[in-house]
Amino acid sequence: QWSSSAASDVYKRQYRNIIMTNYLELLYLISFTGILAVAYSYLLSGQILSSSAGNARMQEIAEAIQIGAKAYLNRQYKTIAVVGIIVLAIVSYFFSYLVGLGYFIGAFLSGVAGYVGMLISVKANVRTAEASRQNLQSGLTIAFKSGAITGLLVAGLALLAITIYYIILINLNVDNREIINALVALGFGASLISIFARLGGGIFTKGADAVSYTHLRAHETIAD
């Protein structure tokens, strides 16, 4: 006779086989949908960057904005990385390396989506202004595409991360509870980075507004 532990292991293996048999095609379809979303965001990026950036003066102003935005992003992501590493160590210590890996995957892909989306949005600003000089429809099209890039990246990378990591965990015969913890950690990592980016972005834009207002009132106080 089998012990209860051996019977439980057999049941778990049979359960996983049923899941993989019935849902593997669905998981692959979801992964393919994520690939399509990322690929389409890449296509939209190419369309935006290939459009006209306006005259020399517009490009000069746009370059200054892009330099400032990139400097802000680099500084912000350094801070996020420090906090992220600390949280990663805590999660890995109290749970397991698989949960920590899930957290890392979510945080990394969320950071990639935010960084790429921000850079594309900044580059799209001047192109939207130039297109709007021709007609409002052209400007609206570029603005809509630039906004769609971030949304597509977030959705596409999320689908890819969840489905692929889930398939890996199933194939490794990981306990069901551990799988849930790992996937929750993946979502937690993505949410943590997005919260930092959202709050930091709001503070950055508000600071830029304040500086512009101060500059208009008194040039000599801009350094203060």
Protein language model annotation of sequence segments:
Residues 1-14, 215, 222-224:
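Single conserved hydrophobic/aromatic residue that forms the stacking wall/gate
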Residues 13-23:
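Short, strongly hydrophobic alpha-helical membrane anchors
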Residues 21-217:
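Hydrophobic, small-residue-rich transmembrane alpha-helices and their short perimembrane loops
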